[in-house]
Amino acid sequence: MKSPALQSLSMAGLQLMTPASSPMGPFFGLPWQQEAIHDNIYTPRKYQVELLEAALDHNTIVCLNTGSGKTFIAVLLTKELSYQIRGDFNKNGKRTVFLVNSANQVAQQVSAVRTHSDLKVGEYSSLEVTESWTKEKWSQEFSKHQVLVMTCHVALTVLRNEYLSLSNINLLVFDECHLAIQDHPYREIMKICEDYPSCPRILGLTASILNGKCDPAELEEKIKKLEKILKSNAETATDLVVLDRYTSQPCEIVVDCGPYTDKSGLYGRLLRELDEALHFLNDCNISVHSKERDSTLISKQILSDCRAVLVVLGPWCADKVAGMMVRELQKYIKHEQEELHRKFLLFTDTFLRKIHALCEEHFSPASLDLKFVTPKVIKLLEILRKYKPYERQQFESVEWYNNRNQDNYVSWSDSEDDDEDEEIEEKEKPETNFPSPFTNILCGIIFVERRYTAVVLNRLIKEAGKQDPELAYISSNFITGHGIGKNQPRNKQMEVEFRKQEEVLRKFRAHETNLLIATSIVEEGVDIPKCNLVVRFDLPTEYRSYVQSKGRARAPISNYIMLADTDKIKSFEEDLKTYKAIEKILRNKCSKSVDTSETETEPIVDDDDVFPPYVLRTDENSPRVTINTAIGHINRYCARLPSDPFTHLAPKCKTRELPDHTFYSTLYLPINSPLRASIVGPPMSCARLAERVVALICCEKLHKIGELDDHLMPVGKETVKYEEELDLHDEEETSVPGRPGSTKRRQCYPKAIPECLRDSYPKPDQPCYLYVIGMVLTTPLPDELNFRRRKLYPPEDTTRCFGILTAKPIPQIPHFPVYTRSGEVTISIELKKSGFTLSLQMLELITRLHQYIFSHILRLEKPALEFKPTEADSAYCVLPLNIVDDSSTLDIDFKFMEDIEKSEARTGIPSTQYTKEMPFIFKLEDYQDAVIIPRYRNFDQPHRFYVADVYTDLTPLSKFPSPEYETFAEYYKTKYNLDLTNLNQPLLDVDHTSSRLNLLTPRHLNQKGKALPLSSAEKRKAKWESLQNKQILVPELCAIHPIPASLWRKAVCLPSILYRLHCLLTAEELRAQTATDAGVGVKSLPADFRYPNLDFGWKKSIDSKSFISIPSSSLVENENYCKHSTIVVPENAAHQGANRTSSAEKHDQMSVSYRTLLDESPSKLQIDVSAELAAINGVSYNKNLANGNCDLVNRDFCQGNQLNYCRQEIPVQPTTSYPIQNLYSSENQPKPSNECTLLSNKYLDGNANRSTSDGCPKMTVTTSTSTALNLSKDKVDSEKNTSSGYSSKTLGPNPGLILQALTLSNASDGFNLERLEMLGDSFLKHAITTYLFCTYPDAHEGRLSYMRSKKVSNCNLYRLGKKKGLPSRMVVSIFDPPVNWLPPGYIVNQDKSNTDKWEKEETTKENLLANGKLDYDDDDEEDEDLMWRLPKEETDFEDDFLEYDQEHIKFIDSMLMGSGAFVKKISLSHFSTTDSNYEWKAPKKSSLGNVPFSSDFDDFDYSSWDAMCYLDPSKAVEEDDFVVGFWNPSEENCGVDAGKQSISYDLHTEQCIADKSIADCVEALLGCYLTSCGERAAQLFLCSLGLKVLPVIKKTDWESTLCATGENCNSEQKNLSPNSVSACIVNSEPSLYKDLEYGCLKIPPRCMFDHPDAEKTLNHLISGFENFEKKINYSFKNKAYLLQAFTHASYHYNTITDCYQRLEFLGDAILDYLITKHLYEDPRQHSPGVLTDLRSALVNNTIFASLAVKYDYHKYFKAVSPELFHVIDDFVQFQMEKNEMQGMDSELRRSEEDEEKEEDIEVPKAMGDIFESLAGAIYMDSGMSLEMVWQVYYPMMRPLIEKFSANVPRSPVRELLEMEPETAKFSPAERTYDGKVRVTVEVVGKGKFKGVGRSYRIAKSAAARRALRSLKANQPQVPNS
């Protein structure tokens, strides 16, 4: 569409070409096709870029608009030519000179050059100062500085006196060069240049060549003159000539609106009134002192605004504006102090009300009456009606919009934007939001002159839309240029305005509004989409305004309509002619101008004649590129290359004329395209053809290298080339709902059974193996946890113990702890004898006893389980052993088994009757080690008690503790009608036998190993010391059980021992399997080797708040342990008195040293505590105190109040399980049993502190108070306990560590996989990244990252993990023997098992009791049913509850239930206790979506508890101990779609796991191999899983690689000691993949392109970089890497290397891994939650960008992108002001005070990118050495790592969810027009907060930050309850 001649249209026939009516169909030119792809010309580049090209090529005068990039061009030109000015001045080095007109402009230029380059800049502004300088002084200046910024006067002096000769200047920049036309120093300077033979390059900058009105002829004259004076060509920026030179011009129309007929006379009346009032104000003769405000000023302003609205828009609008102004005035009147001023304001107020009254006589203000608006308005509405979309289009267009295939495209959602910023009258409803069926077609701007016109016109259009269905589609808004300019000083008022304006613009960009009414400010510099309608409501008064507004109409079909009043139309047509002429002149000056008409006139060439098309196949409709379509293909290809939001990559085409008047073109593609060489086309007859032909040739090349697909479209990132990488698998078909790999999808898996326990039931006369279960009390329970003052019973004191009899050998596994009432007991499984046989009846006896243990002692039998040892999957015998016949060895205790068979009390209650004749006789020895059964109650399931003490001073006649009964005898008589025959017998103090069978973790610690708060320990001790609270029984009324108490105590440990054994064997099996598959480790362990003990890593992992680091003195302890852990302490050792005293003395000294210690500074404490503890925990301690002599220590330890002092200073969390315990008891905390896995298990951390890098040994010895020793592989001493020098490095990881990697946090065990998973996750990313980088040197970043994301996706990891059989081996739910443990020899009876199937409705109360389920927790020991409480306590069921303090009852079941994916109702009737003072709290509604810490709550696997719990954060007491309340999953909102079917599975043999948990497990195992065996092993492990991260080499190449290993094997493999062949071939074991051996990655060969003068270019490009190398302390061997790391994709001057994207991809993964590894190895042992937070605080773009700026990266950055230039500029300024970093905030903020308003400053992603790319460059340059990278980066990062570790920054999102877990809801993302994302967070009842950012994550955190700010601001008003 050529720009038609001016059409002056009368009102009648206004024909507009609107998109809807366009012949090209409704979608041609929809406004949101943001960048239309041009087909016949190359995509135009940014005008600043073109101007820079010109300036590099020849002397140039750049004519620009104000502020649009003069500095950009000047600074970049200086940088491009900087290689010429780095030389020594005295040896002919050159200098760059910047000339400015006045002194105050000097600083500005100086700072720009300093910010963006490392050049040294001298500034000379004052003539007075410099006049006196001598030549020498100047020479010094010139030597010191490379760029000289001077005022023109100084420069003139310097040149005239020849202090600096022109031959030493390489570039002369004239700012405001138009001054050279007049008499000005610039003119003089140019004269000097004229006479000089070699003149420097000249750059003139001017913004004011067009000021105000200007005659075209004059303008042309002026430009010519300037060109002559400056010896340059003038180039204008395209923003002065409308638009990109290429796109079609808008259709320009001038509309004559006709006169206004004032039928009602209202208009005239109002006009008169207003004129009179204004006249009056002007007449008021008030003396105004210059200092004072003019009292009439405001009034005049208001009335003249009102008059303007009346004239332009008519009475209806004048009425509206009067109403608005009255409201404004009220504010002024209220605040006005001065009488006179007030009077005028009141006058105005009255006057406006009068106007309103006048209008009301004529029309009702509520509805719009078109009689009362001006013809302009009517015309405008008419135009708008033309844009009404066709109805049918609604759907297509919305559809089309939402189906754009962009990966990052976020779907629209109904954004609930209430327009608070408009003055909407209450009755108006806010505008309807996107997506309305229409919004899509119109995208228009109406330009008006005054602010008020904009406001009222907007109101009018809204009103019209309500009344006229034709206009209903319009959704308008207004914007008045308040403080929109980028760099104006900001004040609060403006901030508010600014935010509003931003929001209006955002909506317009997002097409939520389709019409914008704007004042002229929007003409300039504001980023607005391409409009298809621009209306000038008021005519443009000068060229600039005309061009700017016209330039907004950029849609392919657009109208530029100027509304003129009849009287103005003549004069305006004149103006318009002038504007057109000026435009033409400027267009000729336009850089690279192409006469646009050529495009239109030139016929489409019949391509085949000129140049044959490129055809793929010969058939008819084969895809082809012709000479006419080629350019479009190239443009499309470039647009698809990876780039940042600021850079739109475009091809560059240069066309030159040959002497014979033919033309040839050279085409350069963007530098991140694999096709790097420039393409030269053949000579053609005209330039246009030359350009097309070269494009065609280029298409052919691109297709051949696989960059265009077979339809000749750009290949996406899912490229065919890399198929093999993606290993496209068919996802298995399952009926399971949910996306594979996500947490939402769960499946059931059988629980694994270790091979060695499968079918290993001994058979008669077949050889057997007998193992003894050794039990040694290694850490007795400390005093302050021993509330009952119970005696401790070390298991090693009695010889009778349990053994395991099997038919297969059991591999060696580490010793492990269980936690009994006596403390920590270390369990070992030792082979006693093998190869012997047993007869049938012996086996039968053993089998009967085995069943007896599980069914009667442990009461684990229930209807669902049947004892069938021959059919059971896991079958072996548990049997008692003892020292037989004086020999000192243990053997099977047959005698004991036979005795039990005979005993009467074996299963029931014996019926012995005592009478007066045969009274009961008390024998003390019978009761010393006895379990007794009361014979008078609970006959079906008698209670069993341990005898704790024999009270010889009490008899049945002693006084009964409670007043109801006189004596014990009376109590029994009254209550049970029992007579005693022996009244002298002593009484027994008894303890319940334990019903808590899960002894895997200590019950006084939560999973962090942090003491649970003890509710007022003092109170408890008192309670247990008074007789009232003891259970006292009479021997005569009890039967003695045949099993002695000592053995019973061991039997209680059996479920935990066997369960742990089972898990460790599964882990050991996995280790052996990996040894086979991956060749890492050995298949079967050496006979003399045992791994160090399983350890929870607690003793040293101190709670994250206190961070006491463990100093080296803790080594002592480990050495002691080494001795200890292999010796089973002989029983008698503990009884040697001598030792005892010595240890007591030792402790005395110790307590003394403690006191002195505490008087010193707390920091000292940090050091010595562990040393002293090490002393306590040494061997002697364990031996001697095993006997209960531990009071001493602890009392000494906590004497006095010195510890309280310590408590205020540093909150030390207990480092061991004994000292300082009651410090932490907070008064009213509930005391969970250890099964209560509060959510803190999310933080659990049991992993020992291991270093992952093999290279540098770090001090990572872990201390531990149990015998458990944690092997740290770098520490040689720690291997003492392994008799010969094996280490986990050669043998494979400790099964304990593997078990940790298999244990989910829901298992509530002492450890879980979370820390390892994080380490594995970052190593995985690193390994895959490095592999892809090295294997595909041609793939650009987009593709690499697509391949990476496919490989590391949870879905892929889940698949590999499943293939490897991990799900069965994982530990996913809490160990709860009565519910989900299958004892050996048992099978699940399918018919009866439904009680344990999840689907079954209620389990009845009886059933619960029968299974012993409610006897849960060891707390029942605390609240045994005291006989003398309430008569109704007979129902043993309530016993457990009655005695709880109220705060204990907060939860009973204390188990964290899984995500409620079975919608199983829970009847609270199980729990209805009759105790009136206890009430159940009704379950709160919990919306699981946002529970603290766990964003995906579904990770919890279902544990087996019938009462489900949720966290009630409102009761959160301390950092992360939560109170658990009941949560009834059948409520709505529980995070589960109600429709989800419940999964039914058997708890004993199956487990249900979310896919994502399996992926996590794979990562954790990787972390486990990495920490234990090193990086190479971890890579091999990945390969064996099926994730290729190493190249495969053929068998034959192996030898050759071996020789090379020493020199170039990358550093990760160096430590495999190349000298020993076996060490290097890690796969020395026969590998599963016989034919696969893995080699080492090779560094991609070329990093520089072959290029004739590559070396020279390289030196030019990196001149000055040596300073940077000094700064980072690393010197590059291959400088090309250095250049590449700093080259942005837009920097096309670099023709020799790639851009930084690939290196950034590599560096990103390297830094992530190095930082994660560093944090993981931190001796402070951060918990998983803290690790995650630290990692995200440190590995993010903001931090990287800030560091990059701090270390001057930006000064070396090479990019040609104006927007990026400005963002970096802003950011650098901001950093300088701030000089202080914030964590987590991805968008940094300007000022701290009043943060509500200040604008988030944008962090240039490119800065973070080069920070990463440099890391990648160092990695490649140093031969893949991670150490080298860390050596350079750690010093830079260290301050931040330290700062954050000491004070962990929380992500705003997490903080908000922790603050408002129930009420904060995040909306889905909404896309804004400019490609940003908006997220709204609603905090129910407290408001909605929006955040906008470049990604969902950034937006979400911005929203959360706003919400937090607001919540925190409002907090104090809440009264503290």
Curated annotation (Swiss-Prot):
InterPro entries: DEAD/DEAH_box_helicase_dom, Dicer_dimer_sf, Dicer_dimerisation_dom, DICER_DSRM, Dicer_PBD, Dicer_platform, dsRBD_dom, Helicase_ATP-bd. The keyword Transcription does not apply. Binds 2 magnesium or manganese ions per subunit. Residues 433-602 form the Helicase C-terminal domain. Residues 1848-1913 form the DRBM domain. Residues 409-433, 727-746, 1270-1289, 1782-1801 are annotated as: Disordered. A motif (DECH box) lies at residues 175-178. Mg(2+) 1 binds at E1317, D1396, E1399. Residues 1277-1404, 1665-1823 form the RNase III domain. Its EC number is 3.1.26.3. The record marks K1805 as: Important for activity. Residues 895-1042 form the PAZ domain. Belongs to the helicase family. Dicer subfamily. This is Endoribonuclease Dicer. It comes from Gallus gallus (Chicken).
